Structures are given as C-alpha cells and as structure tokens.
C-alpha cells in the first residue's frame, strides 16, 4: 500500500462530490468495497464507503454535532483524547482494507471535509500519498438542493456551504490539491480530469470506452435544483456577502489564482461576528 495515491474528494454535500468520485473511479480509481446504496436523493449512487459514513456520524454525534452542524466549534477548537484516537484507528482500517486493490483510492464522503486532519493523518500513517480535489458549486444551487432534500433554510445552507468550503480549503494548504467547479465537471469532464492528472499527478486512463461510460453516467438529470428555486431576501446580508466572496475566490482558484489571505479574512470576520457559533446553526433532531 505504501506510495499509493488516495484521492480525497473535498466539498460540500450537493456540490457534485458523488459525480466527481464516480468519474475518477471510471477512469481507473479504486472504489469502496462496501458502498452506501443509492436512494431517491442520489439515484445514480453516492460512491462513498458505507463504513466511513457510519464512523464519521458516530464521531460527530459523540461531540453533539452532525453533518448539518454549521457551527465551527470542532474545527476551530479541536481536542485529542480517547475518542479521537479510536476514530483514527477506525479510519486507518477503512483506508487499509475497504477499497479495491488496484488504482488510486477514491475517497468521497462530504463529512470528511469537516474532519480532514484525521483522515489526512491516517493516510500518511499508512504511507499513502493524499491528494485533494476540492469541488465547489454555486451556493444558491446547493441551498435549493438542500431545501428539496432536507428542508434546510437558505441561511442554514449558506452557513454550511461557508463552513465546508472555508475549512476544506484551510485544511489542505501545503498539500497536493486542485480546485474544480461542479459546472466544469458537468459541462466537460475530460479537461477537468486531464488537469487533475497534469497538476497534481493523479494517475488516470481515458479511452473511448471510458468516455462512453462517463458520458452515460453524467446525464443532464444529475444537474438539478437551480438557484431560481430559492429566496435570498430573508437571509442575513452579511452571510450573503461572505458566501458571494468565497464563491468568487474559489472560482478564481479553479483558474490557479487562489487568494488564501482573502479566505482567511472572511473566516476571521465570520467568526468574530458570532454567527459561526449561532444557536440556529446547531444540528436538530
């Protein structure tokens, strides 16, 4: 296993993480041996390890959190003790034994974006070579999708979008990484995969059979829940402004112009405002 690439698909839920993970697997990546099954919200499949969802959920729940906890408490004030040590052991087991034996390992599970230090450390412990592909999507489209699937308010969805994208960027600095947009993948996936290969060394193979398979998978039906379906007028104007600024930075990042200082300032302003720990952002039953 030493020296094998592990591709972490980083990003917010409903941002194309499933689609991108499947594209990488069709291009030669190793998928989980036990997949989370598809359902009404993702009929084309999630392409994520079922056990990863289970251990991530349990780890978050043990700390009064969840995937839809938009607060930044665990990310800004991390602790390490028996709970975290056990979690690391479980991650190592999944990465070591939970994937097909050949090709770069493709790890997609949106909760991982909020827990990247643990998953990165586990990969390094196994002497895997982590690489991070950060996919982002128009935040209004994400909010529309989360409302349709989970009934989340626009403001809650925007706060989640901020959390996952700001933390996902912060926790991959200095590591092999690349930023891509959902729209790029859906419009023309092949240049995106080629760019990942060229810029961060992901080993992929593309031939006519793969082009056909990916083309069949990336149907227009996957691109649903557009921004026109939501109303931003009731959202805190500061939240709207922060989301817009982060989205602009990420779009430039996909063109190789990442402004980390701008993202640092937004995160600082967001935390200082008190909104990052607001009670309405906490998980609900």
Enumerate the language-model features and the residues they cover.
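Proline- and acidic/polar-enriched loop/turn elements at helix boundaries
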Residues: 36-37, 135, 207-210
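PAPS-dependent sulfotransferase catalytic core
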Residues: 1-88, 214, 220
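PAPS-dependent sulfotransferase catalytic domain
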Residues: 88-206
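Glycine-centered secondary-structure boundary/capping sites
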Residues: 56-71, 127, 151, 186, ...
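Generic detector of well-ordered alpha-helical segments enriched in charged/polar residues
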Residues: 53-60, 88-96, 140, 144, ...
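A structural signal for well-ordered alpha-helical scaffolds and beta->alpha junctions
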Residues: 17, 45-49, 84, 88, ...
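A polyampholytic, Gly/Pro-enriched intrinsically disordered region
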Residues: 55-60, 151-160, 227-234
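PAPS-dependent sulfotransferases, especially Golgi type II membrane carbohydrate sulfotransferases
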Residues: 1-2, 198-285
């Amino acid at each position: 296993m030493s020296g094998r690439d592990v591709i972490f698909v980083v990003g917010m839920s409903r941002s194309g993480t499933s689609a991108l993970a499947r594209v990488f697997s069709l291009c030669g990546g190793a998928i989980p041996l036990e997949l989370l099954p598809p359902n009404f919200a993702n009929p084309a499949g999630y392409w994520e390890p079922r056990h990863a969802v289970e251990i991530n959920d349990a780890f978050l729940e043990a700390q009064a959190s969840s995937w839809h906890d938009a607060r930044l408490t665990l990310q800004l004030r991390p602790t390490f003790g028996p709970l975290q040590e056990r979690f690391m052991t479980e991650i190592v087991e999944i990465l070591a034994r939970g994937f097909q034996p050949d090709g770069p390992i493709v790890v997609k599970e949106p909760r991982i974006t909020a827990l990247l230090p643990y998953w990165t450390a586990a990969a390094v412990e196994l002497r895997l070579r982590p690489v991070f592909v950060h996919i982002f999507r128009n935040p209004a489209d994400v909010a529309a999708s989360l409302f349709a699937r989970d009934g989340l308010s626009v403001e809650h969805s925007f706060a989640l979008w901020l959390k996952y994208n700001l933390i996902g960027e912060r926790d991959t600095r200095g590591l092999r990484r690349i930023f891509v947009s959902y729209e790029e993948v859906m419009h023309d996936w092949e240049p995106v995969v080629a760019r990942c290969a060229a810029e961060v060394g992901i080993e992929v193979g593309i031939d006519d059979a793969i082009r056909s398979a990916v083309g069949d998978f990336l149907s227009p039906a996957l691109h649903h829940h557009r921004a026109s379906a939501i109303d931003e007028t009731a959202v805190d104007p500061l939240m709207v402004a922060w989301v817009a600024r982060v989205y602009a930075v990420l779009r430039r990042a996909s063109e190789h112009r990442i402004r980390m200082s701008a993202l640092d300032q937004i995160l600082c302003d967001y935390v200082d405002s008190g909104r990052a720990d607001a009670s309405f952002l906490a998980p609900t039953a």
